[in-house]
Protein backbone atom coordinates (compact mmCIF):
# COMPACT_ATOMS: atom_id res chain seq x y z
CA UNK A 1 0.00 0.00 0.00
CA UNK A 2 1.48 3.22 -1.03
CA UNK A 3 0.87 6.60 0.53
CA UNK A 4 1.26 9.93 -1.13
CA UNK A 5 2.80 12.80 0.74
CA UNK A 6 1.13 16.17 0.31
CA UNK A 7 3.74 18.92 0.48
CA UNK A 8 3.10 21.46 3.22
CA UNK A 9 2.57 24.99 2.00
CA UNK A 10 5.24 27.31 3.21
CA UNK A 11 5.85 30.93 2.52
CA UNK A 12 8.81 31.32 0.29
CA UNK A 13 11.42 33.98 0.96
CA UNK A 14 10.51 35.61 -2.30
CA UNK A 15 6.85 35.97 -1.29
CA UNK A 16 7.77 37.37 2.10
CA UNK A 17 10.07 39.91 0.50
CA UNK A 18 7.28 40.93 -1.86
CA UNK A 19 4.85 41.49 1.03
CA UNK A 20 7.47 43.46 2.95
CA UNK A 21 8.17 45.59 -0.09
CA UNK A 22 4.46 46.33 -0.53
CA UNK A 23 4.04 47.20 3.16
CA UNK A 24 7.09 49.43 3.02
CA UNK A 25 5.75 51.14 -0.09
CA UNK A 26 2.36 51.85 1.49
CA UNK A 27 4.07 53.08 4.67
CA UNK A 28 6.20 55.51 2.67
CA UNK A 29 3.11 56.58 0.74
CA UNK A 30 1.29 57.27 4.01
CA UNK A 31 4.17 59.35 5.35
CA UNK A 32 4.41 61.28 2.10
CA UNK A 33 0.69 62.00 2.21
CA UNK A 34 0.98 63.29 5.77
CA UNK A 35 3.81 65.65 4.83
CA UNK A 36 1.98 66.77 1.69
CA UNK A 37 -1.15 67.47 3.73
CA UNK A 38 0.76 69.77 6.09
CA UNK A 39 2.51 71.59 3.25
CA UNK A 40 -0.72 72.02 1.29
CA UNK A 41 -2.50 73.36 4.37
CA UNK A 42 0.36 75.79 5.02
CA UNK A 43 0.52 77.09 1.46
CA UNK A 44 -3.25 77.25 1.06
CA UNK A 45 -3.61 79.26 4.29
CA UNK A 46 -1.04 81.79 3.11
CA UNK A 47 -2.47 82.04 -0.40
CA UNK A 48 -6.05 82.34 0.84
CA UNK A 49 -5.12 85.30 3.05
CA UNK A 50 -3.16 86.92 0.23
CA UNK A 51 -6.03 86.39 -2.20
CA UNK A 52 -8.54 87.72 0.31
CA UNK A 53 -6.40 90.81 0.85
CA UNK A 54 -5.95 91.60 -2.83
CA UNK A 55 -8.57 94.37 -2.71
CA UNK A 56 -6.74 96.22 0.07
CA UNK A 57 -3.44 95.67 -1.69
CA UNK A 58 -4.82 97.11 -4.93
CA UNK A 59 -6.33 100.04 -3.04
CA UNK A 60 -3.33 100.93 -0.89
CA UNK A 61 -0.44 99.49 -2.85
CA UNK A 62 2.91 99.11 -1.15
CA UNK A 63 2.03 101.94 1.25
CA UNK A 64 -0.12 99.43 3.14
CA UNK A 65 3.03 98.03 4.74
CA UNK A 66 4.60 101.30 5.92
CA UNK A 67 1.71 103.72 6.39
CA UNK A 68 0.48 104.52 9.92
CA UNK A 69 -2.98 105.76 8.91
CA UNK A 70 -5.78 103.34 9.77
CA UNK A 71 -9.24 104.71 8.95
CA UNK A 72 -11.82 102.11 7.86
CA UNK A 73 -14.44 104.83 7.28
CA UNK A 74 -12.33 106.38 4.51
CA UNK A 75 -10.89 103.02 3.39
CA UNK A 76 -7.37 104.01 4.37
CA UNK A 77 -5.30 101.20 5.81
CA UNK A 78 -1.71 101.26 7.01
CA UNK A 79 -0.25 98.20 8.69
CA UNK A 80 2.80 99.78 10.31
CA UNK A 81 1.12 100.40 13.69
CA UNK A 82 -0.06 96.80 14.30
CA UNK A 83 3.22 95.45 12.91
CA UNK A 84 5.13 97.68 15.32
CA UNK A 85 2.93 96.60 18.23
CA UNK A 86 3.35 92.92 17.37
CA UNK A 87 7.13 93.10 17.24
CA UNK A 88 7.54 95.35 20.31
CA UNK A 89 5.28 93.29 22.58
CA UNK A 90 7.05 90.10 21.52
CA UNK A 91 10.48 91.64 22.18
CA UNK A 92 9.39 92.87 25.63
CA UNK A 93 8.14 89.39 26.40
CA UNK A 94 11.43 87.83 25.35
CA UNK A 95 13.51 90.34 27.34
CA UNK A 96 11.61 89.27 30.44
CA UNK A 97 11.02 85.59 29.71
CA UNK A 98 14.50 84.50 28.60
CA UNK A 99 16.45 85.40 31.79
CA UNK A 100 13.58 84.22 34.01
CA UNK A 101 13.38 80.92 32.10
CA UNK A 102 17.14 80.47 32.37
CA UNK A 103 16.95 81.03 36.12
CA UNK A 104 14.10 78.56 36.50
CA UNK A 105 15.84 75.91 34.42
CA UNK A 106 19.15 76.27 36.24
CA UNK A 107 17.40 76.25 39.63
CA UNK A 108 15.56 73.03 38.82
CA UNK A 109 18.66 71.27 37.47
CA UNK A 110 21.42 72.49 39.79
CA UNK A 111 20.12 74.27 42.89
CA UNK A 112 16.76 72.85 43.97
CA UNK A 113 16.71 69.73 46.18
CA UNK A 114 15.51 66.58 44.48
CA UNK A 115 12.19 66.47 46.34
CA UNK A 116 11.34 69.96 45.07
CA UNK A 117 12.33 69.58 41.41
CA UNK A 118 9.42 67.47 40.22
CA UNK A 119 6.52 69.44 41.79
CA UNK A 120 7.96 72.81 40.76
CA UNK A 121 8.71 71.58 37.24
CA UNK A 122 5.22 70.13 36.91
CA UNK A 123 3.63 73.36 38.13
CA UNK A 124 5.56 75.39 35.57
CA UNK A 125 4.63 73.01 32.77
CA UNK A 126 0.96 73.25 33.75
CA UNK A 127 1.11 76.99 33.07
CA UNK A 128 1.47 76.16 29.37
CA UNK A 129 -1.94 74.49 29.39
CA UNK A 130 -3.86 77.46 30.81
CA UNK A 131 -6.09 79.07 28.13
CA UNK A 132 -4.85 82.42 26.91
CA UNK A 133 -8.12 84.12 27.83
CA UNK A 134 -7.39 83.32 31.49
CA UNK A 135 -4.08 85.14 31.19
CA UNK A 136 -5.91 88.05 29.59
CA UNK A 137 -8.45 88.26 32.41
CA UNK A 138 -5.68 88.06 35.00
CA UNK A 139 -3.85 90.84 33.20
CA UNK A 140 -6.96 93.03 33.04
CA UNK A 141 -8.10 92.60 36.64
CA UNK A 142 -4.77 92.14 38.45
CA UNK A 143 -1.87 93.48 36.38
CA UNK A 144 -3.57 96.59 34.98
CA UNK A 145 -4.50 98.02 38.44
CA UNK A 146 -0.94 97.40 39.64
CA UNK A 147 0.42 99.14 36.55
CA UNK A 148 -1.97 102.06 37.07
CA UNK A 149 -1.28 102.62 40.77
CA UNK A 150 2.40 101.73 41.11
CA UNK A 151 4.47 100.84 38.06
CA UNK A 152 3.37 103.54 35.60
CA UNK A 153 3.79 106.46 38.08
CA UNK A 154 7.20 105.09 39.08
CA UNK A 155 8.33 104.83 35.46
CA UNK A 156 7.05 108.32 34.67
CA UNK A 157 8.84 109.88 37.64
CA UNK A 158 12.17 108.03 37.55
CA UNK A 159 12.78 106.81 33.99
CA UNK A 160 10.52 109.03 31.91
CA UNK A 161 12.75 112.03 32.60
CA UNK A 162 15.91 110.37 31.29
CA UNK A 163 17.28 111.32 27.85
CA UNK A 164 16.86 108.94 24.92
CA UNK A 165 14.95 106.16 26.72
CA UNK A 166 12.68 108.51 28.65
CA UNK A 167 10.23 108.74 25.75
CA UNK A 168 9.52 105.04 26.06
CA UNK A 169 8.26 105.41 29.63
CA UNK A 170 6.13 108.54 29.44
CA UNK A 171 2.38 108.28 29.38
CA UNK A 172 -0.87 108.49 31.31
CA UNK A 173 -1.40 106.00 34.16
CA UNK A 174 -3.97 103.95 32.28
CA UNK A 175 -2.45 100.57 33.06
CA UNK A 176 -3.28 99.19 29.63
CA UNK A 177 -0.68 99.46 26.90
CA UNK A 178 2.20 97.81 25.11
CA UNK A 179 4.22 97.21 28.28
CA UNK A 180 1.33 95.45 30.01
CA UNK A 181 0.83 93.23 26.97
CA UNK A 182 4.54 92.39 27.01
CA UNK A 183 4.32 91.37 30.68
CA UNK A 184 1.39 89.05 30.01
CA UNK A 185 3.12 87.52 26.99
CA UNK A 186 6.25 86.93 29.05
CA UNK A 187 4.29 84.93 31.61
CA UNK A 188 2.73 82.90 28.82
CA UNK A 189 5.98 81.95 27.06
CA UNK A 190 8.04 81.27 30.19
CA UNK A 191 6.71 77.67 30.53
CA UNK A 192 7.72 76.83 26.95
CA UNK A 193 11.22 78.29 27.13
CA UNK A 194 12.01 77.08 30.66
CA UNK A 195 10.86 73.53 29.89
CA UNK A 196 13.14 73.33 26.86
CA UNK A 197 16.06 74.83 28.78
CA UNK A 198 15.58 72.42 31.66
CA UNK A 199 15.54 69.39 29.39
CA UNK A 200 18.69 70.43 27.53
CA UNK A 201 20.50 71.39 30.75
CA UNK A 202 19.96 67.82 31.93
CA UNK A 203 21.94 66.58 28.92
CA UNK A 204 25.15 68.29 30.07
CA UNK A 205 27.58 65.55 31.20
CA UNK A 206 27.99 65.46 34.95
CA UNK A 207 31.76 65.09 34.57
CA UNK A 208 32.04 68.53 32.97
CA UNK A 209 30.19 70.25 35.79
CA UNK A 210 31.96 68.31 38.52
CA UNK A 211 35.33 69.13 37.00
CA UNK A 212 34.47 72.83 37.02
CA UNK A 213 33.30 72.66 40.63
CA UNK A 214 36.50 70.83 41.57
CA UNK A 215 38.53 73.71 40.13
CA UNK A 216 36.69 76.14 42.40
CA UNK A 217 34.07 77.47 39.98
CA UNK A 218 30.88 78.92 41.39
CA UNK A 219 27.42 77.87 40.25
CA UNK A 220 27.16 81.03 38.14
CA UNK A 221 30.50 80.30 36.45
CA UNK A 222 29.44 76.72 35.76
CA UNK A 223 26.14 77.83 34.27
CA UNK A 224 27.73 80.57 32.14
CA UNK A 225 30.94 78.82 31.06
CA UNK A 226 29.89 75.17 30.93
CA UNK A 227 26.13 74.68 30.70
CA UNK A 228 25.24 77.47 28.28
CA UNK A 229 28.02 76.83 25.72
CA UNK A 230 27.21 73.10 25.73
CA UNK A 231 23.48 73.67 25.12
CA UNK A 232 23.66 76.86 23.09
CA UNK A 233 21.93 75.59 19.96
CA UNK A 234 18.99 74.08 21.82
CA UNK A 235 18.61 77.16 24.02
CA UNK A 236 18.44 79.44 20.98
CA UNK A 237 15.90 77.13 19.40
CA UNK A 238 13.75 77.32 22.52
CA UNK A 239 13.99 81.10 22.55
CA UNK A 240 12.76 81.36 18.98
CA UNK A 241 9.97 78.90 19.74
CA UNK A 242 8.82 81.22 22.50
CA UNK A 243 9.16 84.22 20.17
CA UNK A 244 6.94 82.56 17.60
CA UNK A 245 4.38 81.87 20.32
CA UNK A 246 4.46 85.50 21.43
CA UNK A 247 4.07 86.90 17.91
CA UNK A 248 0.80 85.10 17.27
CA UNK A 249 -0.91 85.47 20.65
CA UNK A 250 -4.36 87.03 20.38
CA UNK A 251 -6.83 87.03 23.25
CA UNK A 252 -4.50 87.71 26.16
CA UNK A 253 -3.01 90.68 24.32
CA UNK A 254 -6.41 92.02 23.27
CA UNK A 255 -7.44 92.30 26.93
CA UNK A 256 -4.57 94.53 28.07
CA UNK A 257 -3.02 96.35 25.11
CA UNK A 258 -5.78 98.96 24.69
CA UNK A 259 -6.60 98.27 21.02
CA UNK A 260 -5.67 101.71 19.72
CA UNK A 261 -4.39 101.89 16.14
CA UNK A 262 -2.15 104.88 16.80
CA UNK A 263 1.61 104.70 16.57
CA UNK A 264 3.31 105.94 19.73
CA UNK A 265 6.90 105.49 20.93
CA UNK A 266 5.71 105.20 24.53
CA UNK A 267 5.27 101.71 25.94
CA UNK A 268 2.69 103.00 28.42
CA UNK A 269 0.11 104.17 25.88
CA UNK A 270 -2.53 101.90 24.32
CA UNK A 271 -1.58 100.14 21.11
CA UNK A 272 -2.50 97.06 19.14
CA UNK A 273 -1.05 93.99 17.45
CA UNK A 274 -1.95 92.25 14.21
CA UNK A 275 -3.68 89.33 15.92
CA UNK A 276 -5.58 91.53 18.39
CA UNK A 277 -6.78 93.88 15.65
CA UNK A 278 -8.05 90.99 13.53
CA UNK A 279 -9.83 89.37 16.47
CA UNK A 280 -11.53 92.59 17.54
CA UNK A 281 -12.70 93.86 14.15
CA UNK A 282 -13.10 90.91 11.80
CA UNK A 283 -16.65 90.00 12.83
CA UNK A 284 -18.10 93.43 12.02
CA UNK A 285 -15.82 94.39 9.14
CA UNK A 286 -17.11 95.52 5.77
CA UNK A 287 -15.85 93.93 2.57
CA UNK A 288 -12.95 96.34 2.06
CA UNK A 289 -12.07 96.31 5.75
CA UNK A 290 -12.14 92.51 5.81
CA UNK A 291 -9.74 92.51 2.89
CA UNK A 292 -7.32 94.70 4.85
CA UNK A 293 -7.56 92.39 7.87
CA UNK A 294 -6.88 89.34 5.71
CA UNK A 295 -3.84 91.07 4.28
CA UNK A 296 -2.73 91.79 7.86
CA UNK A 297 -3.05 88.08 8.56
CA UNK A 298 -0.77 87.36 5.62
CA UNK A 299 1.76 89.85 7.03
CA UNK A 300 1.66 88.06 10.38
CA UNK A 301 2.20 84.75 8.59
CA UNK A 302 5.25 86.15 6.80
CA UNK A 303 6.68 87.65 10.00
CA UNK A 304 6.31 84.39 11.92
CA UNK A 305 7.68 82.36 9.03
CA UNK A 306 10.67 84.71 8.75
CA UNK A 307 11.39 84.33 12.46
CA UNK A 308 11.39 80.54 12.17
CA UNK A 309 13.62 80.65 9.08
CA UNK A 310 16.10 82.94 10.85
CA UNK A 311 16.11 80.59 13.82
CA UNK A 312 16.80 77.63 11.56
CA UNK A 313 19.66 79.43 9.81
CA UNK A 314 21.20 80.42 13.14
CA UNK A 315 21.03 76.84 14.38
CA UNK A 316 22.67 75.57 11.19
CA UNK A 317 25.44 78.13 11.53
CA UNK A 318 26.02 77.21 15.17
CA UNK A 319 26.08 73.51 14.37
CA UNK A 320 28.68 74.10 11.65
CA UNK A 321 30.85 76.09 14.04
CA UNK A 322 30.57 73.39 16.67
CA UNK A 323 31.41 70.78 14.04
CA UNK A 324 34.56 72.65 13.12
Swiss-Prot record:
Keyword NAD attached: no
Sequence ranges assigned to domain ABC transmembrane type-1 in this UniProt record: 83-311
Entry-linked InterPro entries: MetI-like, MetI-like_sf, Phosphate_PstC, Phosphate_Transport_Permease
Function text: Part of a binding-protein-dependent transport system for phosphate; probably responsible for the translocation of the substrate across the membrane.
Transmembrane regions: 29-49, 87-107, 126-146, 173-193, 235-255, 291-311
Membrane topology category: Multi-pass membrane protein
Main location: membrane
Location(s) in or outside the cell: Cell inner membrane
Family designation: Belongs to the binding-protein-dependent transport system permease family. CysTW subfamily.
GO biological process, one term: phosphate ion transport
This protein's UniProt keywords: Cell inner membrane, Cell membrane, Membrane, Phosphate transport, Transmembrane, Transmembrane helix, Transport
Highest rank taxon of the organism: Bacteria
Annotated GO MF terms: phosphate transmembrane transporter activity
Organism (species): Xylella fastidiosa (strain 9a5c)
PANTHER family in alphabetical order: PHOSPHATE TRANSPORT SYSTEM PERMEASE PROTEIN PST, PHOSPHATE TRANSPORT SYSTEM PERMEASE PROTEIN PSTC
Record's protein name: Phosphate transport system permease protein PstC
One cellular component (GO) term of this entry: plasma membrane
Pfam families in alphabetical order: BPD_transp_1 (PF00528)
Amino acid sequence: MTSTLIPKETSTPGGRDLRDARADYFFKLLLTAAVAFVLIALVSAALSMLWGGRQALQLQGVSFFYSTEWNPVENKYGALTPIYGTIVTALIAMLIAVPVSFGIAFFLTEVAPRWLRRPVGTAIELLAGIPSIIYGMWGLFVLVPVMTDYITPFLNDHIGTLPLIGTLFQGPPLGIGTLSAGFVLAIMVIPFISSIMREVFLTVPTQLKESAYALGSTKWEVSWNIVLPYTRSAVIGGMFLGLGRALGETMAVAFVIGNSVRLSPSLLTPGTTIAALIANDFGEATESYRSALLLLGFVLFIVTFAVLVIARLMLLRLSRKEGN
